[in-house]
């Protein structure tokens, strides 16, 4: 597993990088990769749609410096912005016990353990994907799979500035609202800090031999 920090990168460029790596993994010319990054403001739609859950016009969204993008991930509508850590694992799961369901569970587990490292008690919520702190959604998960290789992944709210979420009905769940690690911890935490911890916890959850690569 190679860990790659892409910094702040547009959604389309990150998707291109994922698909290129997915092809390489499929062909056996590259190892699995975990991409950690942030996106400029963007609202993304999953395979379940979600445009009906955009609460403002696309023109108004553009005035906020954001756009709407259709993706191949699972799930409904969500948003990304600087101050939110995004994690895209491109990895084979065909030989992992439990398949896609276990992969999904382990991604949630990694996020829960990461939050705990900062003193925040997060948990799963039955019937509602992702990771929650009480009624607040800390982390959204939506993956794509091609020939048992994953792409897309997870977004983890770090900064307390989450105003872009005001433009959507989060994941199409009426009454759901976002929260962030900084808000729950009562102090501002940087995405760089969270990336480092997430990478460590991912290694513990998914494999005993994961080694970070620059």
Curated annotation (Swiss-Prot):
Recorded coiled-coil stretches: none
Q: Name one GO cellular component term.
A: cytoplasm
Q: What is its EC number?
A: 2.3.1.181
Which of the seven top EC classes does this enzyme belong to? Answer: transferase
Q: Which InterPro entries match?
A: aa-tRNA-synth_II/BPL/LPL, BPL_LPL_catalytic, Octanoyltransferase, Octanoyltransferase_CS
Q: What does this protein do?
A: Catalyzes the transfer of endogenously produced octanoic acid from octanoyl-acyl-carrier-protein onto the lipoyl domains of lipoate-dependent enzymes. Lipoyl-ACP can also act as a substrate although octanoyl-ACP is likely to be the physiological substrate.
Q: Which family does it belong to?
A: Belongs to the LipB family.
Q: Which HAMAP family match?
A: LipB (MF_00013)
What name appears for this protein in its UniProt entry? Answer: Octanoyltransferase
- Gene encoding it? lipB
